[in-house]
Amino acid sequence: VRFFATAAKGTEPALRDELRELRLPGVRADRGGVHFEGDVGHAARACVWSRVAARVLLEVTRFEARDGEALYEGVRAQDWTVWVTPQTTLAVRATCRSSQLTHSQFVAQKTKDAIVDLLRDRLGDRPSVDRDDPDVGVTVHLAKDQATVYLDVGGLSLHARGWRALAAEAPLRETLAAAILRLSGWDRERPLVDPMCGAGTLAIEGATWARKLAPGLGHARFGFERWASHDDVERRAMAELRASARAQALPAGPPVFASDVSPNVLALAQRNARAAGVELVLERKDVRDLGTTHPPGFVVTNPPYGERLDGDFALYDGMARAFKLLHGHTVAILAGTPAIETAMRRRPDRYWQLYNGPIECRLVVYSIE
């Protein structure tokens, strides 16, 4: 069976490396995510352990769909009764790119019609639609008139770990934070420092990664556990997978320091860390007053920009001056504006182009001599 794990634009190499570490077969990076092969057990492992994947999708079928009729017939040709019954709820999402069918809503509607018509003809009744929390999530991706139809193995987006209370302004998605930590080269042994921590996402993701706390344990049930095909054999395998994941957790990791000027967001970071089951060394401090750690640490941060910055460009100069004093440290910055790199006044050792939602950013990494 073919699977596709989706990832934020630019983070595909991080997801590829992660899925290879999970020893999944046939791992291959592509635009928007990573392909792998195997069975539902392999996909379940990705759901429990992947920090970077947003969704894990099972490929049901692919076919040419130049018009609505071809799309309907292609979807209807599958035996959906394997996964869907009249008692289960259903939701369909669609994306269209470079195709004659351009309206994603039309594509989603046609796909849903094909599935419910098939069930009504076969079983005498049809499933109902639940867009918020469906038992079976179907995704259709149309590119160059080729339709690929997927089932959502994970269910709700995997970025939701279950620990986030309320988001501070402009929160960083957990999956993007995990990708930043992986791409920047943190070894999970050096002290980790986020001097502009906000709600604590980077610090918490770092602490949970270092302690091998499986991110998927925050999900009570994944999507495939609600499919009609989910049987006792799979249930036992899932119970074992979850028990094994819990047993691998380490009691402690390297120190993780998180600071911010706002007492309100620090309180939020504390609440989030507690919910995630990790300890952060929290301190109210301006980034311009940042000191060194012993041994030299790894600084990773997402400085404010745009509306969050409120026109305070002097912050970047002060931040850059503080970073230049961190001899022996590594500094990784998610730069949402070129002004951040300009303030650093040196070329980064490594960089990646990433997207924080719609915002184009550069992850820049500096080794401070």
Residue ranges and their predicted role:
Residues 2-136, 142-144, 153-159, 166-167, ...:
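Accessory substrate-recognition/RNA-binding modules or partner subunits associated with SAM-dependent
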Residues 296-302:
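Short SAM/SAH-binding signature in class I
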Residues 81-83, 290-295:
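Short amphipathic alpha-helix with an adjacent loop that forms part of the alpha/beta core around
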Residues 213, 219-243, 294, 305-340:
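SAM-dependent methyltransferase catalytic-core segment centered on the flexible catalytic loop
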Residues 172-291:
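Conserved S-adenosyl-L-methionine
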Residues 149-185:
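SAM-dependent Rossmann-like transferase core, predominantly class I methyltransferases
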